[in-house]
Amino acid sequence: DTLSLREKIAAFQAAYIRCIDRNELENWPDFFLPQCQYTVTTADNHRAGLAAGLIWASNRAMLQDRISALRHANIYERHSYRHIVGLPFIVDSQAQTASSETPFMVARIMHDGETSLYCTGIYHDVYNTSANTLRLKSRIVVCDSSRIDTLMAIPL
């Protein structure tokens, strides 16, 4: 039933953003299937059907590598995120998959306390629903603006 699925996806979204907002990034890849797609792109590129994105990963190992590089190799100004998400809209539901769209806003908090609106957009998600726990098969993060004012280090 759709309401139950919507509640499951909303709970999944809450756990996902909690993981990122609490800087528990080593757990972030666990929200995805081993073979998955994670892309961050702009609304213009998404509308034009352009596959390239600001971030592009085709499996969980690439997501794990991204976090490892973030923790040990990349140099960036320390900051954190605070997500606010809307309710998911169920686009489609099949026997073992479901797709949804969820709007989001992300505030960026810099190490000195400065807080600004960093990004708004929508998550286009495809979930594997065959197990007791939802896992993402695909997450396309579509940012409303084409202007990202800093290196996107932390995943959205």
Which positions does each model-derived feature cover?
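A generic "alpha-helical surface" signal
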Residues: 7-10, 54, 61, 118
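A solvent-exposed, acidic/Ser-Thr-rich amphipathic alpha-helical stretch
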Residues: 34-103
